[in-house]
Amino acid sequence: MAITQFRLFKFCTCLATVFSFLKRLICRSGRGRKLSGDQITLPTTVDYSSVPKQTDVEEWTSWDEDAPTSVKIEGGNGNVATQQNSLEQLEPDYFKDMTPTIRKTQKIVIKKREPLNFGIPDGSTGFSSRLAATQDLPFIHQSSELGDLDTWQENTNAWEEEEDAAWQAEEVLRQQKLADREKRAAEQQRKKMEKEAQRLMKKEQNKIGVKLS
């Protein structure tokens, strides 16, 4: 039974190889036919009659042959010059306002000053009485509320007393702050000691409970 199955399998594989070979041959023959049918034959001859004719090219030396060789100006005898002068006169002068104006600077002469006489002027000197300096008179201000300025005496000890009072007040405040700080520190230390004592008591109680059990 096994031998017959092996022979049948071998026969099927042979048929499959034959069919695949035939299929490849058929595909190759079909491709060759398509390529042979798609080929395009190109013409080997060229028709020169269809090419457009080029225009005749002229040399650059012959371009100015037809140009005029002389120019005649009508209306001679200086008419052209007079027309140009009239046109120049009609044009406005744009730079007229830009011409600089030169002005002479004024000279200031300073005369040498003569020494002033601060004394009382008399007829011998040539100075005027309005230019002479007078001695300052003492100014005495009297008021009904403040009294005479000469009789007022400054109390120098008042400033020192105020400074002492301010310093004493600052010292009292500083001492009070220091006492409050020490009080808070003592309170915190007391609370810390109480917590430590409670913790030790709980620890002792736990030990006693363990021993009893």
UniProtKB/Swiss-Prot annotation:
GO CC terms: Golgi membrane; secretory granule
Modified residues (Phosphoserine): 36
Segments on the Cytoplasmic face: 28-213
Domain notes: The coiled coil domain is necessary for the homodimerization.
Extracellular topological segments: 1-6
Modified residues (Phosphotyrosine): 94
Extra facts: May serve as a prognostic marker for cancers such as adenocarcinomas of the lung and breast cancers. It is present and overexpressed in many patients suffering from breast carcinomas, its level of expression correlates with tumor grade, suggesting that it may be involved in cancer immune escape. According to PubMed:12672804, it is however not directly a tumor-associated antigen, but it rather modulates surface expression of tumor-associated O-linked glycan Tn when it is overexpressed, suggesting that it contributes indirectly to the antigenicity of tumor cells.
One GO MF term attached to the UniProt entry: peptidase activator activity involved in apoptotic process
Protein location: Golgi apparatus membrane
GO BP term (any one): adaptive immune memory response involving T cells and B cells
Residue numbers bearing the Phosphothreonine modification: 41
Oligomeric form and interacting partners: Homodimer.
Name this polypeptide is given: Receptor-binding cancer antigen expressed on SiSo cells
